[in-house]
Amino acid sequence: MIVKKKVQSCIKLQIEARSATPSPPIGPALGQQGINIMKFCKDFNTRTADFEMGLILPVVITVYVDRSFSFVIKTPTAVFLLKKAAGIKSGSEKPKCVSVGKVLISQIYEIAKIKLIDMTSLNLESASKSIMGTARSIGLEVEDNL
């Protein structure tokens, strides 16, 4: 019989690929839970070695009562991927009034393919509609490919 470890807490962070260091926000978040920060940083950097530098990855860290941990690396956030596709640094302060850029429907589908793993959507069409809504919420216009 497999004995399950008792979970103490879950920590959600967004960390740049290959760049985990003990400095804030990682150090304080893990230190409060009694986790070996350097071990996490080494493990994270090793597992993200194949990722593009600068890619922001959501990470869910599960801390167990015996102070051991496991972590799951998710796909990059939709907002990060949309901003990268549009070539912008930040979204609009007034998204319904001011547009900060444009994305093509083909880019939306590519992002939806990436995000489909982490989404509750069952098909590409509904995932794409969700990504389109996210694009509009940060002030991006969605254009058809012509």
UniProtKB/Swiss-Prot annotation:
Any single GO CC term annotated in Swiss-Prot or TrEMBL for this entry: cytosolic large ribosomal subunit
Protein name, UniProt field: Large ribosomal subunit protein uL11
PROSITE patterns registered for this protein in UniProt: RIBOSOMAL_L11
Biological process annotations from GO: translation
Lineage start: Bacteria, Pseudomonadati, Pseudomonadota, Gammaproteobacteria, Enterobacterales
SUPFAM superfamilies xref list: Ribosomal L11/L12e N-terminal domain, Ribosomal protein L11, C-terminal domain
Binding partners and assembly: Part of the ribosomal stalk of the 50S ribosomal subunit. Interacts with L10 and the large rRNA to form the base of the stalk. L10 forms an elongated spine to which L12 dimers bind in a sequential fashion forming a multimeric L10(L12)X complex.
Keyword Ribosomal protein recorded: yes
Family statement: Belongs to the universal ribosomal protein uL11 family.
Source species of the chain: Blochmanniella floridana
Physiological role: Forms part of the ribosomal stalk which helps the ribosome interact with GTP-bound translation factors.
Cross-referenced NCBIfam families: L11_bact
Pfam families linked to this entry: Ribosomal_L11, Ribosomal_L11_N
Processing after translation: One or more lysine residues are methylated.
Keywords attached to this entry: Methylation, Ribonucleoprotein, Ribosomal protein, RNA-binding, rRNA-binding
Superkingdom, taxonomy of origin: Bacteria
GO MF terms held by the record: large ribosomal subunit rRNA binding; structural constituent of ribosome
